[in-house]
């Protein structure tokens, strides 16, 4: 069964733009560099040629990965979701029960994730551990080191 990838319209458009940029800017540059390296002669010992072919393969893999996300995209209208529980698109403030630390996360879809600014994938194990919880409830999240417990302090929507 193919798993859908939840995302906002903005996230979808961002991924489409990234694919377009890769196909129309990066790929032609790599193809040009391959052609230039090919003109150097013997391909068996041509390091530049082999490096650019490898770059081309890695770029194609990235393009295909993004195309797969787009093909499985499920565009979510955040305004239609419940406002009293942790769901896609909300910003949730939690307290680490073990340490008392307060943290804030926004649950986002593919294309919108930015871990440095607290935007985590709703499909990640951490995101899934929070989904469906209400203010005052405790979420248990499985991590390699065991289970972490987080108390839900606040749920907000920035619509």
UniProtKB/Swiss-Prot annotation:
Q: Name one process (GO BP) from the record.
A: regulation of DNA-templated transcription elongation
Coiled-coil residue spans: 53-73
Q: Which SUPFAM superfamilies match?
A: FKBP-like (SSF54534), GreA transcript cleavage protein, N-terminal domain (SSF46557)
What keywords are annotated for this sequence in UniProt? Coiled coil, DNA-binding, Transcription, Transcription regulation
Note whether Transcription occurs among the keywords: yes
- Record's superkingdom? Bacteria
Gene3D superfamilies per UniProt: Transcription elongation factor, GreA/GreB, C-terminal domain, Transcription elongation factor, GreA/GreB, N-terminal domain
Query: What Pfam family is a match for this entry?
Result: GreA_GreB_N
- Which GO molecular function entries does the Swiss-Prot or TrEMBL record give? DNA binding; RNA polymerase binding
Per the record, the similarity remark reads:
Belongs to the GreA/GreB family.
Q: What does this protein do?
A: Necessary for efficient RNA polymerase transcription elongation past template-encoded arresting sites. The arresting sites in DNA have the property of trapping a certain fraction of elongating RNA polymerases that pass through, resulting in locked ternary complexes. Cleavage of the nascent transcript by cleavage factors such as GreA or GreB allows the resumption of elongation from the new 3'terminus. GreA releases sequences of 2 to 3 nucleotides.
HAMAP family in UniProt: GreA_GreB
Q: What is this protein called?
A: Transcription elongation factor GreA
Q: What is the lineage of its organism?
A: Bacteria, Pseudomonadati, Planctomycetota, Planctomycetia, Pirellulales
């Amino acid at each position: 069964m193919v798993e859908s990838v939840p995302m906002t319209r903005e996230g979808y458009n961002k991924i489409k733009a990234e694919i377009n940029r890769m196909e129309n800017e990066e790929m032609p540059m790599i193809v040009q560099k391959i052609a230039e390296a090919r003109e150097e002669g013997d391909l068996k010992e041509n390091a530049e040629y082999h490096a650019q072919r490898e770059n081309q393969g890695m770029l194609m893999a990235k393009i295909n990965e993004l195309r797969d996300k787009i093909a499985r995209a499920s565009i979510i209208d955040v305004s239609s979701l419940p406002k009293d529980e942790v769901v896609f698109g909300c910003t949730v403030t939690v307290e680490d029960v073990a340490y008392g630390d307060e943290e804030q996360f926004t649950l986002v879809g593919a294309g919108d994730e930015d871990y440095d600014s607290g935007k985590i994938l709703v499909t990640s194990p951490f995101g899934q551990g929070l989904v469906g919880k209400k203010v005052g409830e405790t979420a248990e999240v499985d991590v390699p080191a065991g289970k972490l417990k987080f108390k839900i302090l606040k749920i907000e929507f920035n619509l």
